[in-house]
């Protein structure tokens, strides 16, 4: 992994981190400095109902400008950033997995080519890492999610970390279905094809 990570920071795994703040309105709120460490992505506010759940019809993107007029009621601000995991590769990104297979695995594959599939019947790969918490992320996830499900994930990010009525289960299932599909396509499909071309079993 270190060989690939040294090539480009694009290969670093990414996670979605958040900071949460509560406010009681009416009050004018400054939004500056409320993002967690990482690359700022979006700020969403939502009103809390009497049970402490989010009211989905109150969701509002307040990323710009840097202040917000909080209405009456108890409101929650979700600030999401994308944070790189410097010692892990992005297993949701096909280009990264391809680079991983080209080096160092291709080096050993070429060196012992005559033994592959016979004296060397199979290959073992160290466990890939896809975070569950913080939430997994990759640069193309937002566009892929929109293509898969027809709505913008960013507008619904609070539902991944807090309940908001009947929409909660759908958004979470949609999110992990897309993450799972991207993981399968980037990692499992490419590694399986790499092994098959060399007559190897994936152990």
Give each language-model segment a name:
Residues 1-173:
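Mature extracytoplasmic enzyme cores
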